[in-house]
Amino acid sequence: ADFAADREGFLILDEIYQGLSHGPVPYQTGLAVRDDLYILNSFSKFFGMTGWRLGWVVVPPQAIEPITKLAQNLFISPSTPAQYAALAAFDEDAMTIHGQRKDAFVQRAARLSDGLQRLGFRIPVAPDGAFYLYVDISHTGMNSMDFCWRLIDEFQVAVTPGADFGEHNADHFVRFAYTTHLEAIELGLERIEAALTAWGVNT
């Protein structure tokens, strides 16, 4: 915040994964730090409403009018049912369900991490939020693109090459998502083990 303020810059906070931490995280609103922040959020992650195209932005008062004009020229309004669904997402019962989903992500992360490491994959940074693992596949001897294509073509397991997320060592990394249920994760691990065996990769 100080860095941006010293340079008369804007500070934009992307809080799209807010609420999906795997452990307790003290939360303080960004507005307690500065009152001229731009804060972006969405219903797609924590609320599980991917594809509904719903979100919100908190902006300084002087930015409300230009941001409104920009929004009116970039997209049309979401459907009325989607907006009512978004309101319902804040109901007490709905918030309980969201909390249960978050707990399920923690269990899935642990199972997927354990299973992949047992198969020789390295996970340099354990996840502490969201629903992704960034995994080192160096021991397979493949680059990430080849690994991803072969895994989906031959064993019907979809993962994403590291190049989609940056350049640093991207050829050696892929991203796994644990957005599915534990049974599917178990099946995926079985298929990955079969793939490594078929490809002659030592685990």
Region annotations inferred by a language model:
Residues D6-R7, L119, F155:
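Helix C-cap/helix->beta junction micro-motif
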Residues I12-Y17, N41, V125-P127, Y132-D136, ...:
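Short beta-strand segments
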Residues Y38-D103, A110-G115, A195-L196, V201:
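Conserved core segment of the aminotransferase class I/II
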Residues L87, K102-S113, P124-I137:
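Conserved glycine-rich beta-strand-loop-beta hairpin in the small C-terminal domain of fold type I
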Residues G141-N143, R150-V159, F165-T203:
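PLP-dependent enzyme catalytic core of the Aspartate aminotransferase-like
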